[in-house]
Amino acid sequence: MFSREEVRASRPTKEMKMIFDVLMTFPYFAVHVPSKNILITPKGTVEIPENYQNYPILAIFYVKYLMKKNPYDLLPSTVNWPEPYVVVNTITKRFQDHKLFANKNADVYVERLQNAIASGIKIPESKKNERLGQPKKTKNVTKEIEETFIDATNARKELDEYFRKLQDGTLTGDLEGGLCKVKTLISCKALFGGHTQELQFMATNVRKVWIGEIVCGMVSNKNAIDDNDLEEEERNASGEQTTTAREESEALDTTSNGLDALNTQINAIETEESFWEAIRALHNELRTSPTQLEECRKAAVFLLGHKKILQTFTKQKDTARALFYINLKECLGTSWNLEYTEASDARKMAIKGELQN
């Protein structure tokens, strides 16, 4: 029989218990066979790679880490080994976080441990925080390309060359899988030359088309709602209304309040003269504001009861669109073709641009 003193002496010290915990000595077992450079475990045999052969403790720790991570799986025949310094960082972190060092400095123990099990391993300064179990952070390197065209003399030629470089990959050839942000600044004078008056016409026509589309869209939505209400009334007259139909009718009634309620909320347009005056005011505005949307709604309410004026307004909108295309063609020349084609490879893009006098 062992005496009490002998039993007490055979127990591991606190420092040894800490080492057992950090290196996961139990309950995971791995036998190192130096002659064959393998590790034999209850879950399979693992071959030690060359960069771990001089550091068997690191190899054993990593294999035990895999067994702990997947307790119900066998070890794969081909193990994906990290760099040795990643395992060293993991062991160091486990030392520093151990409860034994709650009020102590672990640096002395860490230095002694590294000299014992990882002597000669250099840890890059930028990799000191890389440990096992951390998701790899991928950083997309964004290449910024900025071009500015302000000279009206050679602008067309320079733009044609610029788009050609984008198309053939000259500007984006060294991305190495990263992202590319292209920023192009083209002055109106460089792009349109002396056609500043045409540019003003284009801006005015764009404004007319935009206002026209908003007003006509509101009119179309109201007409669609009214058509649905009419069908609902016919179903009510024939006695074929169902519970679902009643719910739909209530929803349509709620939606149709959008334009009708504006007659009581804002001053409605009552005459044709006031309608065209409101439209001209919208065309002359240089900036957008919430009040302009209300004016568009008033115009839409007026057009709902004046179909002939609606037809005239629609024709004017279409004419403005046609004039915009004509002005654009005159400013840019006989051909302006810009096409974008998406590709699976971030380094590739298809951009075609042509400028001709």
UniProtKB/Swiss-Prot annotation:
GO BP terms: plasmid partitioning
Keywords: Plasmid, Plasmid partition
One Pfam family here: Rep_4
Keyword Ubl conjugation: no
InterPro entries reported in the protein's UniProt record: Rep_fungi
Stretches for region Disordered: 226-257
Function: Plasmid partition require REP1, REP2, and a cis-acting DNA sequence (known as STB). REP1 may act by intercalating in the yeast nuclear matrix and binding STB either directly or via REP2.
Name of protein: Trans-acting factor B
Organism whose genome encodes this protein: Zygosaccharomyces bailii
